[in-house]
Amino acid sequence: MCAASASPDNLVFHMKNEMRNIKYKPVDYQQLRALTEAKKLASASAKLKIRKAMLTSKLSKEQTLIKQHKQVWWQEYQRLNEVRCKMESEIKSLLNEENIGNECLCDLTNFEQELSEQQCTYLKNVINPIQQLRADLKYRQHHTLQHSHPHIEFNSMKVLEEVDFVKKQLKTVFERLRLEQQRIENDLSDWSIKILDHSLEEKTNPLSELPIELESLECPYPDLKSSILSEFYKFTQKYQKKLQDFNLQLEDIYRNCQLSEEDHWIYQAILDQYPGDLFGRRTLYLDMLQRYFPHKSRHDLVEHEKYCDQYRFAIEQQNILISNWNKNKKDFIQKAVLTLTEACATHEMESMLAKDKKKQQELCADLKAKVRQWRAHQEEVARLEMEISARRREKEEEKEKLWKKKELLQRAEKKKKIKKYWAKKKQKWQEMEMRDLQRLEELKKLIAEQSLKDRERVKYRQELLERRLMEKKEVALQEAHEDKERARRLEALRKQVAVVAQFDPVRMMSDTMASKARMGIEIEEEFILQKPLFTLNTYNEQQIISDPRLRFELALREAGLHRTLYAKEILPKISPQKPPRKDMESTVFKI
């Protein structure tokens, strides 16, 4: 029943028939409108604050990005300036060398002289007249502003015609220079394309060419050489297939690239400005690319970055493939040369063995006769050597006896010298030992005195540390006591300002004294003039005089020093006897 009465249809029925329900109160639409307006204003102000915060954050982010860009630009400017100076110095040193027979250097010097002459003529015929015209126009403008003449209109028309004529001439000159620049850029691009094609041919041709080392080698076994060449062709075909895959991949990446050649050159130059170890490098160069290419979205730039990474990765893989091929080719050639040389050596050995067998049989007979003759000679030589060695042994025994006698005499003399030397050495050692013992006793005394001083210092430092710790403890106890006293005073103040009035509905609903006075109820018949209107709770005379600030000021006035700098500095530093309450302290001058 309650659910049925609370349904929307019943509520609509009650509202149409003006049948009130005790559960619902009448709605104050004006109050609701005021609340909604206040909410709208609060939400609008919050929205405005959020927008301002977003704008300030965006501006600060933009400023930080520009600051980082400036740092990178300055570093890049310094680097490019150093490179430019280095290249100019190298070019000058190259051109200044005495290369009489070098026609290329002579052509370069002539071309440099021709360019300098063209620059001088351009400055003389184009830039200097423009600067003179500009200075003349500034002078005329300044002159006409200061002095007014009747023929100003005629002169201004003439000047405008002259300026238009100069503009047309400059336009034709700039157009001619632009065409010449475009022609030179096209020539340079053609040469760069030729150089790239030549480099690609140099990269791809070595894979298809047969090495000279394998062609020049001769092998006595033709089957072995043909098998080595077929193995080399299989080896190169595998690498050629991989290289063709990389070339196709590079062509696909170049075809899918959305930027033109000039835009890609700008893109690469911007990326080269920011070093790889820079913090936030990708954010910085993407921001700079969006500034350079406002017609391109961030998605397009990221896609181009992905294509460039793929292109760079493919180039690196291609270079790795070519380096691996060169390395494997060298290894293969070394192995092939080694096998062919071994085959040639074995073939030569086989042919030499066949020849050596015949020679060996012929030499065997000659060797047998020579061996017999050699044995007879050897026996005679051995007999003669034994006789000679016996004679020499007798002579050596006689010499050894004489040498032993001399050695015994020399040893006796050496023993005497050694005894004298050790006596002197022992005396020196005793003197050194006595001197070292005296020095040791002196050092021990010094160390004992120093240790005594160190103990006294340590004891003094310990006493000083204990005194400081006691002072810190006393300060901590004093602070704790002050905190307790402060809490007690705050509690007393809270009790003083606490609400003590009891709930009195009769007094609340009755008339006040002011309303009674207005209506003439309970009015006193006589007005006592001496009666104070209000009760004042102020300081008495004794409390005012006991204030140290007043007493110090009176003393300064009596001495005539109340207007000096000393009084101005010392009076604000004097604190009252009782510090003021924190809730009564003024904060007007602290804002």
Curated annotation (Swiss-Prot):
InterPro entries for this protein: CCDC148/CCDC112
Sections of the chain in a coiled coil: 166-195, 352-417, 466-498
Sequence intervals crossing the membrane: none
Alphabetical keyword list: Coiled coil
Family annotation (PANTHER family): COILED-COIL DOMAIN-CONTAINING PROTEIN 148 (PTHR21549:SF1), MUTATED IN BLADDER CANCER 1 (PTHR21549)
The protein's name: Coiled-coil domain-containing protein 148
Organism: Homo sapiens
Organism ancestry: Eukaryota, Metazoa, Chordata, Craniata, Vertebrata
Underlying gene: CCDC148
